[in-house]
Amino acid sequence: MNQFESTQSNIFSLRSSDRCNVFGSSSSSPSLLNRWIDIWSTSISDITSILVLAGTKTAEIEGISAAGATKESRRFTAVADAEFLLHGPTASRRWPLPPLSAGVSPALISYVASDLIGVKSLIAQAGILQTPSFPCLSIESPSQGPSECITTGKAMDINRVENLFEEGMKMGLELASPLLLTECVPGGTTTALAVLTGLGITASELISGSSRTPPMTLKKKIVEKGLQSLSLGAKPCPKELLAAVGDPFQPFAVGLLLGARKVKQPVLLGGGSQMLAVLATALASIDSSLKDDFVEDISIGTTYWLANESLSLSIGQSAFQSLIKLVEDSFEVSLLGLSAGLRFTKSSKQVLRDYEIGYVKEGVGAGAFVLLAQNNGVSCKKLIEECEFAVDQLDKI
C-alpha cells in the first residue's frame, strides 16, 4: 500500500503565505524559485491554460485505472472532468462525473482553484469517442477514436503521431503568454510508464496511478508485453516509441512543449508521471546542447498527495521525486518540481479526506491550479472551504 511521508524536498512560501514543497535539482536555487513566483503571478490574467483530453483502449483493461469504476464509465471520464472544470457543480452538466470507489474527481479541485483566480482553460481533444457539449478544439478527426491498447505494440499509426506532433508544435509556436498544460487521459499513467521505460528509464516501481492500491504488477506486465516485440534499440526514435506504446495526448503535448519553448514561453506542466513522460520524450527529441536552455523555464506542478507518495523503491524520498531524479540523470538536466500545500486532513467531507489515505491523488491539473491559486494570494483555508461547498452542490444534483 502507498503511504505519505516527509520527503527530501524544500519548504517554500508562496504569496498566500501558505507553504508548498519544491524538489528537483533546481529547487535549491532561490533565484529560480523567485523567478517562478514572478512568472506565475504577474501574468496570471493572461496565461494560456490548455487541458488536453485523450483516449487509449489501455484504460479498458480490468483493474488498470480508478478514473471511473468500470471500463464503460472510464470512456466518458475525460469529457465529464472537462465539463466540470469549465462549469463546476451545476445541474446543467451533460456528463455526470464517473462513479469512483472513493474520493471525488480532481476536476473539483481544479475548478475551485481556477475559478478563484479567474483562469479559463481551452479544452483540446484527441481520441475521444464522445462529442463534447462545450467548446472544444479537435486536434484530429473524432473518427480516429482512442489509441489501441499498448499490449499490441501498435498503439497508433506513425502518421497519426506525426500529425498530432505537428498540431502541437504549431499551437506552441503561436503562444504569446506562459503555458499551463494539463491532461485527462484514463489509463495515462500506464502509457507514461511504457514511454519512460522505452526511453531507458527504470520507472516500473515509481509510478502508481489513481488507485489507493496501485496495480503496479499489472502495469509492468502490460508495458513489457507492448515493448517486447519492438526493436527500438538503446536510443529509440521518440515518435516511433509513441506510435508503439503511447497515447494521443503524448505526441500533441510533446510538440506543444517544444513549440512553446522555441518562442521562449515558460511552461507549467500540471500533473505527475504523464507530464514527466512528455518532458522526457521532448528531451529525447532535441540536441543535447539545447537541453539546459530548454528546461530553464519548465516546471512541474502537482499535489501534495502525489509528491509525497512512498512506493517500494522510493526509500528516503517520494516515488515522484525519485522519478524526477531518474529523468534528470538520464538527460543530464536540472528540473524544478513543486507540490501544492492543500491538505484535506480536517475536512468535513469524506470524499475529500479520501485524498489523505491514498485515493485519486492528482488529475486535471489539480496540483498546478492550486499552486497558481496559492501563488496569487488564495489561502489553503479558502480552497478547502470552496471545495467543501462544491461537494455540497454536487450532492444536491
Swiss-Prot record:
What CDD domains does the record tag this protein with? DMB-PRT_CobT (cd02439)
Which GO terms label this protein's molecular function in UniProt? nicotinate-nucleotide-dimethylbenzimidazole phosphoribosyltransferase activity
Q: List the disulfide bonds.
A: none
Q: What Pfam families has UniProt attached to this entry?
A: DBI_PRT
Give the family per the record. Answer: Belongs to the UPF0284 family.
Q: Which PANTHER family match?
A: PTHR38811, UPF0284 PROTEIN SLL1500 (PTHR38811:SF1)
Protein's name in the database: UPF0284 protein Pro_0435
